[in-house]
């Protein structure tokens, strides 16, 4: 079974079994919704158990979650630095033009058929996502995911076509 990373447990929150999660999912409200099932993986990326979300709320830069049946800090403190993953079969179908992060990360980025690099990470700083493009011999390029910049995405070909506005890439 394939699993996709949706968050990392970075700490406990209070004494009632809540955990601070650093989310790496594109649909946190949906992914951490009460009743949803996730898989827990240890620091060595080994499957530990399936868990069910009992509660979820946002707090600053974290998602605060609680697992069903684990209502005290003693139940969950051993999960610090563990990963939360979703099974591939639990991913919802997306509309045309929508993509999961795991589909975008690893794609090659081209401008005018010239390879710029590979998407290595997706940041969520505010209004739109920012793709971090790893380039050979240059600093990473921070590419906003907005229509004037991203011209096309072809998952099957592993390719993204872009037009970089003047001033966005200071290494050219």
UniProtKB/Swiss-Prot annotation:
Keywords assigned by UniProt, alphabetized: Chaperone, Cytoplasm, Ribosome biogenesis, rRNA processing
Gene that encodes it: rimM
Function per UniProt: An accessory protein needed during the final step in the assembly of 30S ribosomal subunit, possibly for assembly of the head region. Essential for efficient processing of 16S rRNA. May be needed both before and after RbfA during the maturation of 16S rRNA. It has affinity for free ribosomal 30S subunits but not for 70S ribosomes.
Written domain comment of the UniProt record: The PRC barrel domain binds ribosomal protein uS19.
Oligomeric and partner information: Binds ribosomal protein uS19.
One Pfam family, short name: RimM
GO molecular function: ribosome binding
Protein name: Ribosome maturation factor RimM
Gene Ontology biological process terms in this record: ribosomal small subunit biogenesis; rRNA processing
Homology family: Belongs to the RimM family.
NADP in keyword set: no
GO CC annotations on file: cytoplasm; ribosome
Gene3D superfamilies tied to this protein: PRC-barrel domain, RimM
Main location as per UniProt: cytoplasm
Subcellular location: Cytoplasm
Stretches assigned to the PRC barrel domain: 96-168
